[in-house]
Amino acid sequence: QKILPVSRILLGGALESPGAEVTPGVLSALAVPVSTKNPDPYEISGQLQGRRLALAKWIVDPRNPLTARSVVNRVWQHHFGKPLAGNPNNFGSKGAKPTHLGLLDWLAADFMEHGWKLKRLHRMIMLSATYRQSGSHPRLDKLKNEDSDNSLFAYHLPRRLTAEEMRDSLLVATGELSHVQGGFPVMPEINMEVALQPRMIQFSLSPAYQPSRTPGERNRRTIY
């Protein structure tokens, strides 16, 4: 029978400075136990198998107050350019309070009830009256004065596109987008001056950047 390796706290994050021994467990601050049968309900069983599964089940436990809310908050931010709850990287009691707490909770509950399906969540948001609002408003100046950052989502604010979205859109518009998926990593064309610079990989110099040979290989989707 295999013995579990001992895990220790690394002081300062350094491998050379192991500290006290630590056992697998979850955040007790969230008050969502792994099992009430264990002496420590927040400790994951010491068995060799099942530790990752136990952690995964704890993450998606309906009682977990963060996971579903964090996901729907991110999706909302993607579509509107700003989240319902500010500080999405620091989600929780120390972050900014949600502007629409009831909506955030409802979206999170609906998301879990329907199997954590992201496509359904995207579709629901994009078909909403809020998402389909115009950027103009009969009292736009008054709204901007009273709600300068549009935290109430009274009108549509243009969202900055990512470089990946812009590249894919250009390839679609020109009819050059390749819909092939899988296989080796794609190397798109980049600025020649950048491509000719030697690359540092694993502490050694690598040859200059070489794009994939044919347009069919280069013009794959940036985002899957």
What role is predicted for each listed range?
Residues 1-221:
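Primarily short, surface-exposed interaction patches in extracytoplasmic proteins
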